[in-house]
């Protein structure tokens, strides 16, 4: 199935990875170009990309699946979890650290319970143990009914168990 935007461009392309947001962001009627300048990788191969223009942190699994986006840039970086001028990223265990060059501060982000569930489910799935990850994916869907990754994980679990019709249903929900 192909989906197109009003301009005629295909929006659901499966042959490429979508890193971060669109090329341009808009803030207070001004357009800015995205700039993924810094990366760090944790011990399990999950990686974090820092967009220094928009102040966002993009969290990916080892297979390049986007897991979460957090942080932001509000101009002065005075709101919790936002930055004025993010200049570095570091990952240590279950924490992500961002250095703000203008404010001279380091912000520490801790993994949430939901993030921990996504991380564990994705680790199990990437190891090929789809059925073992099923319970975690079900919990994720119960917390976020819009989790495409959760539906994809359940599709793999049902496929692994030979439940092909159910697998197809979950794959459709996951837009896979």
Regions inferred by a protein language model and the residue ranges of each:
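Conserved beta-propeller blade signature
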Residues: 46-49, 95-99
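Gly/Pro-rich loop segments of beta-rich domains
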Residues: 6-35, 63-87, 123-124
């Amino acid at each position: 199935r192909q989906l197109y935007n009003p301009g005629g461009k295909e929006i659901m392309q499966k042959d490429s990875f979508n890193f971060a947001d669109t090329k341009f962001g808009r803030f207070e009627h001004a357009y800015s170009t995205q700039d993924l300048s810094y990366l760090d990788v944790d011990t399990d191969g999950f990686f974090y990309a820092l967009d220094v223009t928009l102040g966002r942190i993009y969290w990916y699994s080892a297979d390049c699946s986007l897991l979460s986006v957090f942080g932001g840039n509000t101009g002065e970086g005075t709101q919790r979890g936002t930055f004025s001028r993010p200049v570095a990223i570091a990952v240590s265990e279950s924490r992500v650290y961002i250095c703000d060059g203008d404010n001279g501060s380091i912000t520490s982000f801790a993994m949430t319970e939901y993030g921990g569930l996504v991380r564990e489910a994705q680790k199990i799935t990437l190891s090929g143990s789809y059925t073992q990850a099923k319970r975690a994916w079900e919990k994720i869907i119960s917390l976020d009914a819009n989790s495409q990754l959760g539906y994809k994980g359940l599709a793999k679990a049902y496929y692994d168990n030979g439940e092909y019709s159910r697998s197809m249903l979950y794959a459709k929900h996951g837009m896979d």
